[in-house]
């Protein structure tokens, strides 16, 4: 497997002493001269992979929201939301589409890698000229989630006292994140979106948009997501949190002044999460019990599947922040669209948007029952299932199926 062969970062480097900062492996080095290679080189002496002021903004624009009241009763001062747009807003302002990213995504939904964007757009198969979400017809908006680390205010951002927020950053909820996105819609002059679409954790925000702001969402697409977080999902999230906070270089969340951050903890959290993003059948078919190169697992070497997880852990380190991982994971854990609305069925039953619910048949993170609940309880909903060996990530990998499903839905809008 090409992925399994990269593996420069290892979560269990034989003989590496974790208490020695110099022993911490760096992310796998991409091709020489690529945007990713420059990012990795620049981050080699940094405790975070977050985008920071002074970095190339790429296509990002920034909305200064100011003081942001939170559901907890706290106020987040100096709030900024990073976002990107594609296409033109029609004179009637009726062609806007909001695309909401998942846990470790960002605003770069479509487009090539380049300065400010170390990776190509994460959903370019669905968004772009001539795609199902056609940027020649629609005005597409995507923001980096509040609490994230790719330009929006988060724990790695500078607090009013001039220091990074770190451990002082307040906990956020899905409703806080959606409220910030409503401020963006207001600033762009968008009263209602023709379509709000979100997958995975992005689907949490999408359903919250429709439940909390029904007049602002005409069509809704909920992909591989749920109305509330299940106990199984809470358990996986908890393990990822523990992996980060147990890293001795976490420093209780205040690691920004140190040369090394909690890279092993963040890498382990990513490896745990990535396991839930793929299916057992795919991992067995793809890797089986094959050894990684000439490594021998009998004497401490790795299986290919271990190298594969190491590779994905290392990739994340170059572009993400451990505190943001905790903040956004927390918002996933407390997600419950029915809270304060009479319960889940009542909240979903009040949604007025024409709705598409998409699930993946091999998804072991968001189970079919969650899609069934959404489709059953939302009045004007239809459900489609993606057939895939790839598990939760099937919504990204099965591009042809997703394209056909979304085109069918939008044709009736």
Across the structure, where does each feature detected by a protein language model lie?
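Cap/lid segment of the alpha/beta-hydrolase catalytic domain
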Residues: 118-120, 131-182, 233-234, 238-245, ...
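Catalytic active-site module of serine/aspartate enzymes centered on a nucleophile-bearing elbow/loop
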Residues: 381-413
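Short beta-strand/loop motif that positions the catalytic acidic residue
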Residues: 351, 357-359
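Short glycine-enriched nucleophile-adjacent loop
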Residues: 203-214, 220
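Alpha/beta-hydrolase-fold enzymes
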Residues: 216, 222-315
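Catalytic-loop region of hydrolases
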Residues: 22-99, 113
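N-terminal cap/lid subdomain of alpha/beta-hydrolase-fold enzymes
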Residues: 84, 89-158
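Conserved alpha/beta-hydrolase "acid-adjacent" motif
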Residues: 364-370
